[in-house]
Swiss-Prot record:
Documented EC number(s): 2.7.7.6
Organism in which the protein naturally occurs: Arabidopsis thaliana
Active site residues per record: 694, 769, 926
Matching InterPro entries: DNA-dir_RNA_pol_helix_hairp_sf, DNA-dir_Rpol_C_phage-type, DNA-dir_Rpol_phage-type, DNA/RNA_pol_sf, RNA_POL_N_sf, RPOL_N
Its biological purpose: Nuclear-encoded DNA-dependent RNA polymerase that catalyzes the transcription of DNA into RNA in chloroplasts using the four ribonucleoside triphosphates as substrates. Required for chloroplast development and leaf mesophyll cell proliferation.
Descriptive protein name: DNA-directed RNA polymerase 3, chloroplastic
Transit peptide residues according to the UniProt entry: 1-95
Subcellular location: Plastid, Chloroplast
Any one GO MF annotation of this record: DNA-directed RNA polymerase activity
Length: 993
């Protein structure tokens, strides 16, 4: 025992360890008496070296324990709460070392003599429970005011540093890129480094100088012309240095190429306006920076004084965190907005110069005897498309076409693209108005209005008091701190490096294009054309998907070493919230969701471990998510070996996680569950994983609450049940019944009988799910037909194209009929909403309404007016909002848009209430996320807010607002409600689950 005590077991601070605990038989000390004295002691484990700890116990107990603890350097703000312990993980050691005042509570009692040795007091990192309680509940009360002030100062310095970085990210991105190309040019000349550059960098470097030269030439040309003969874009092309303008044009153009244009063509009007907008934004920042830079020799004394005062004012505002006021100073330096016509004219000329300057070179032959070939990287041409096959109505528009060599190399090096709207290092500005909030300097608007002036005017007119709850909700979503899950990112990178084509990742290789047959046989040639067309289509789709993956990964790589980051949110015109950053965000694919986690960690607790297991079962899916909670827990217990193998050996193990519907999210859940189960104190394990609670066909849930129909409410889990009700299975069962009945009819008199016989074995939940899901959002017969046709193609039973089309038509009609039978009340409300919209639109008014949170919504569907702009490249037709509303679109879009505004309202109400309850919250429309330990609290809140929302007379208020706004129009009465008691929702465990 003496030797054991002398050995002094230590804490192994290995950053990559995952709570690997080595335990021996131990007798825990009793909790200290409440009267015990305590003193503070500096935490040596913040210094990243081993801390020797040996056991002190009663004379009857002489066991010792050795623990290997996952290192957790100090985080941004170290506060210990009853249900919260900040994550110490993945922080810079330099910052960890600055925390000198962090405290450890040590009992001041006489040390126990054991075999002549003075035993040291023990530090318990996980057990026993009273120690956990001490750390999680009592520690914050024992930190004195001096220590709090010291930490506050540290946090302030750190925050100021992050804020300065954020300002640089937003204002100097293009400047840094220009400097990089200059440095690359210099290195290429001095060290011949060009062959080692990534494809995109090599390509941009080859374009940079020629494009810069032609822009400089154009600037001089326009400057020397008289005002009468100068081009319309002349005053604006001179506003930036040529090198910066060249970088913006290159990156914006390539960004458009990588944004999903499958055929490698971008519409001229889209490219021109996009470039024009980027130039205008940079001009505003450039003018301000230029005005406040160091003194010029020709400056008068007054000008020098003005510059100095302006610089001091802005620096002072930024230091005092008054970013909004600083931004106002910057904005005051600008001019009036340019407008689409100006943006298009300047953008078109810069596009023309890019086409002139940018070339690509095919690989040289082995012999090297042939003359190097250079081809234009971009070509301007006109494209003609028909509305549908066989139609005489054609549309002709200009496009910029990318060379195939450019497309081939682009998707392998997309990570070198500049992405301006990256996640923020500091919390976003609070929303206070239409354009007041979000990013610090980049243009931010509370709503994506897509040019609808009526919607913009409605938003600009609202007061902060009217829509303060909407602003609060967006601030809540924007203040949720995220970080990159490095474990999952590492797995993604390895799979991607190996060629993808697994876990939902696209194949990094193209499919081979079949060679043209030597035969002149027409049928053989036709077959080859069809095969080649199909292969080219697949390759274009793969190119687009590869670019998308690379853009997501490039952001993840950029942010992986950050302690945390934030996503400013804004709204679509219906009131649904979205992150403003477009690539790596939690509304995106399984890849993104698996790669992201909360920056703040919280202990699992008993409830959290329970919900973690259910969450894992939901992610695995395959029908498991439709079982009862007990059955899902049993599923996880039965696959614990697979789960642990997935966590410990995801690449070379059994790969059970790859069978999940959401593989990367499933793997992330496997990792944290394995950590918990291997810990001697699983409830104390810190989890950063967001746990989801999803609505059950949420659109129908909202309709059921509006109509108070008991049958429909039960079908979508507004009523408690032993297991989740599955509306998709119910619809598929009804479709099967109808088809079975049709199949018994005479095929001579009933053509659908033959189709019914074929389809009766094809009907399942998956066949009808998408149509049922989108029915409440206004899916048409044509939309339903296309959805079902895709599912039938996947099954592969019907291969004949004509038969497939006929089967899809029949299935769509039967599915929509079954929906109408089961959801009569919902259909009645949809029809009433559509009728009201038609009445309003027929009087040439767009449909307007106010959401329960005070957000004004205006449907933007008007007949567009074409505005022709003559540019140096071609005549551009800019679409702008007309004065005549589109009656058909106003009518068909109102029911789904209205329900979307209600589900957005429910999510925002829940977000604010969760924040007030101390929860971290993220929302994905009808999927609400929080820490595992807080799921029970969030579940209670989201149910209470749903009942609160629908206890208001929503349809009656809507009708009253229509009658007040349009007193000369006559509207039908609100459909009758059923007798469903909304309070039943509070007791339904599968309402969201």
């Amino acid at each position: 025992m003496a030797s054991a005590a002398a050995a002094s077991p230590s804490l192994s601070l290995n950053p990559t360890s995952h709570f690997q605990h080595q335990t021996s038989l131990v007798t825990w000390l009793k909790p200290p008496p409440s009267s015990a004295l305590f003193r503070r002691k500096t935490l040596p484990f913040f210094e990243r070296h081993s801390l020797p700890i040996s056991a002190s116990s009663s004379s009857s107990s002489s066991s010792s324990t050795s623990l290997s603890v996952h290192e957790k350097p100090i985080s941004n703000s170290v506060h210990f709460h009853g249900n919260l312990i900040e994550s110490f993980e993945n922080q810079d050691s330099s910052y960890a070392g600055t925390i000198k005042g962090a405290s450890l509570i040590e009992e001041l009692e006489n040390p126990v003599e054991r075999n002549g040795l003075s035993g040291r007091r023990r530090l318990f990192m996980q057990d026993p429970p009273w120690i956990s309680a001490l750390f999680l509940k009592g520690l914050s009360k024992m930190v004195d005011q001096t220590l709090k002030i010291e930490r506050k100062d540290i946090d302030k310095r750190k925050f100021d540093s992050l804020r300065r970085r954020q300002v640089k990210e937003e204002t100097e991105a293009w400047e840094r890129m220009v400097d990089e190309y200059r440095d690359l040019e210099k290195e290429m000349c001095e060290k011949n480094l060009a062959p080692n550059l990534p494809y995109v960098k090599h390509m941009f470097l080859g374009w940079f100088q020629p494009l810069k030269d032609v822009i400089e030439r154009e600037q001089k040309l326009q400057k020397n012309k008289s005002k009468k003969v100068r081009a319309a874009y002349a005053p604006h092309i001179e506003l930036l240095p040529a090198d910066k303008m060249a970088v913006i044009v290159m990156h914006k153009m390539m960004g458009l190429v990588m944004s999903g244009h499958e055929d490698g063509c971008i519409q001229v009007v889209q490219a021109a306006v996009s470039i024009g907008i980027a130039i205008e934004q940079e001009v505003r920042i450039h003018n301000f920076l230029k005005r406040t830079r160091k003194n010029n020799a020709g400056d008068s004394q007054e000008e020098l004084k003005e510059k100095q005062l302006l610089r001091k004012r802005v620096n002072s505002l930024i230091r005092r965190k008054r970013i909004i006021d600083a931004l106002k100073v910057v904005k005051s330096e600008g001019t009036k907005p340019w407008g689409r016509a100006t943006q298009a004219k300047l953008g078109s000329r810069l596009l023309e110069l890019l086409i002139e300057a940018a070339y690509v070179q095919p690989p040289l032959t082995q012999s090297g005897d042939s003359i190097p070939e250079f081809r234009p990287a971009f070509r301007h041409r006109f494209k003609t498309v028909t509305k549908y096959p066989g139609s005489k109505l054609v549309r002709r528009y200009g496009v910029i076409e990318c060379d195939s060599l450019l497309l081939a190399g682009l998707d392998k090096s997309a990570k070198h693209m500049l992405i301006p709207y990256v996640p923020m290092l500091v919390p976003p500005k609070r929303w206070k108005g239409y354009d007041k909030g979000g990013y610090l300097f980049l243009p931010s608007y509370i709503m994506r209005t897509h040019g609808s002036k009526k919607q913009q005017d409605a938003l600009k007119d609202i007061s902060h008091k009217t829509a303060h709850r909407v602003f609060e909700a967006l601030d809540t979503l924007g203040n949720t701190k995220w970080r990159v899950n490095r474990n999952i990112l590492d797995v993604v990178e390895r799979l991607w490096a190996d060629g993808g084509n697994i876990a939902g990742l696209v194949n990094r290789e193209d499919v081979p294009i079949p060679e043209k047959p030597s035969s002149e046989d027409p049928e053989e040639l036709q077959s080859w054309k069809w095969s080649a067309r199909k292969a080219n289509k697949i390759n274009r789709e793969r190119h687009s998907l590869r670019c998308d993956v690379e853009l997501k990964l490039s952001v993840a790589r950029k942010m992986k070493d950050e302690e945390g980051f934030y996503y400013p949110h804004n709204l679509d015109f219906r009131g649904r919230a979205y992150p403003m950053h477009p690539h790596l965000n939690h509304l995106s694919s399984d890849l993104c969701r698996g790669t992201l986690e909360f920056a703040e960690g919280r202990p699992l607790g008993k409830s959290g471990l329970h919900w973690l297991k259910i969450h894992l079962a939901n992610l695995y899916a395959g029908g498991v998510e439709k079982l009862s909670h007990d059955a899902r827990l049993a599923f996880v217990e039965n696959h614990l070996d697979d789960i642990m193998d997935s966590a410990e050996n995801p690449i070379h193990g059994k790969r059970w996680w790859l069978k999940a519907e959401d593989p990367f999210q499933c793997l992330a859940a496997c990792v944290i569950l394995t950590q918990a189960l291997k810990s001697p104190s699983p409830y104390s394990v810190i989890s950063h994983l967001p746990i989801h609670q999803d609505g059950s066909c949420n659109g129908l849930q909202h309709y059921a609450a509006l109509g108070r129909d008991s049958f429909e409410a039960a079908a979508v889990n507004l009523v408690a049940g032993e297991k989740p009700a599955d509306v998709y299975s119910e619809i598929s069962r009804r479709v099967h019944e109808i088809m079975k009945k049709d199949s018994s009819k005479d095929p001579e008199s009933n053509p659908t009988a033959a189709l019914a016989k074929i389809l009766i074995t094809q009907v399942d939940r998956k066949l009808v799910k998408q149509t049922v899901m989108t029915s409440v959002y206004g899916v048409t017969y044509v939309g339903a037909r296309e959805q079902i046709k895709r599912r039938l193609e996947e099954k592969g039973v019907i291969t004949d194209e004509r038969m497939l089309f006929a089967a899809a038509c029949y299935s769509a009609k039967v599915t929509l009929a079954a929906l109408g039978e089961i959801f009569e009340a919902a259909r009645a409300i949809m029809s009433w909403l559509g009728d009201c919209a038609k009445i309003i639109a027929s009087d040439n008014h767009p449909v307007r309404w106010i959401t329960p949170l005070g957000l004004p919504v205006v449907q933007p569907y008007c007949r567009s007016e074409r505005h022709l702009i003559r540019t140096s490249l071609q005549v551009l037709a800019l679409q702008r909002e007309g004065n005549t509303v589109d009656v058909r679109k106003q009518r068909t879009a109102f029911p789904p848009n209205f329900v979307h505004s209600l589900d957005g309202t429910h999510m925002m109400m829940t977000a604010v209430a969760c924040r007030e309850a101390g929860l971290n919250f993220a929302g994905v429309h009808d999927s609400y996320w929080t820490h595992a330990c807080d799921v029970d609290t969030m579940n209670r809140i989201l149910r209470e807010k749903f009942v609160e929302l629908y206890n208001t007379p929503i349809l009656e208020d809507l009708l009253q607002s229509f009658q007040e706004s349009y007193p000369n129009l006559v509207f039908p009465p609100v459909p009758k409600r059923g007798d469903f008691d909304l309070k039943e929702v509070l007791k339904s465990q599968y309402f969201f689950n």
